[in-house]
Amino acid sequence: LQQVLGQGASGIIYRAHRRSEQGNHPVAVKLFKGALTSDGLPRSEKAACIAAGEHPHLIPIHGKISAHPEGELGLVMSLIASEFVTLANPPSLQTCTRDVYAPSTRFSLAVALRIAQGIAQAAQHLHTRGVLHGDLYAHNILWNVTGECLLGDFGAASFLPPDDVVTVMRLQKIEVRAFGCLLEELLQCCDAKDALLQALQQRCLHVNPEVRPSWGEIQACLAEYSAAGCSCETDSP
């Protein structure tokens, strides 16, 4: 293990090298802090990460740590390029449930749309794999200036009940609401305003979960907006 790259409630992430027949390769290693954290059980996070599978907007997982000399649990992940930064900081005592964005964080609508599309695709992928992320916040998202993004941190993740369709739908709509909060924050960081995206955001936050759109509807709306002529631009974080 080398230098610390970051840490959260459930563990510490280190830069490391993975040995193979082809040589040493830089990776990131997450070691969990203990048997129980504020996010839950490390073994639950590990299971959810592995069950999530591969997706362009999820941080790739290469495997789990075994035979650690101190018996610690951990995961081996891809080392993400330094151009990716955390979208926002966790909530403060003042904001309670809302993440804290740097005052300098501004997006074009194109970049905000690209982030929204990536996270919506990742969330839909997780749900089809039976995984509920449980912490769909900006502080768990890495992004770069073109709007490429990665969703990480499965500390609060859980598995959807396979034989209870009603409960699955309700849990998915809770995550849709979380996406609505994220979309609202992204739009607040845009100088330009867009009525279509604001309407989608408001539907995601509807007080009646049954009125909230499905992930398929969200994807279709974002794709339609993108096809209407919104092209990615380069912004500064």
Language-model segments: residues:
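Catalytic-loop of the protein kinase fold
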Residues: 123, 127-144
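C-lobe/activation-segment region of protein kinase-like
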Residues: 150, 155-201
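Activation segment signature within eukaryotic-like protein kinase domains
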Residues: 115-116
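Terminal C-lobe "cap" of eukaryotic-type protein kinase domains
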Residues: 207-213, 217-231
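Conserved short submotifs of the Hanks-type protein kinase catalytic core
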Residues: 70-84
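Structural motif at the C-terminus of the N-lobe alphaC helix and the adjacent alphaC-beta4 loop
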Residues: 48-56
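Short beta-strand micro-motifs within the conserved protein kinase catalytic domain, predominantly
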Residues: 60-73
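ATP-binding glycine-rich loop module of kinase domains
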Residues: 9-47
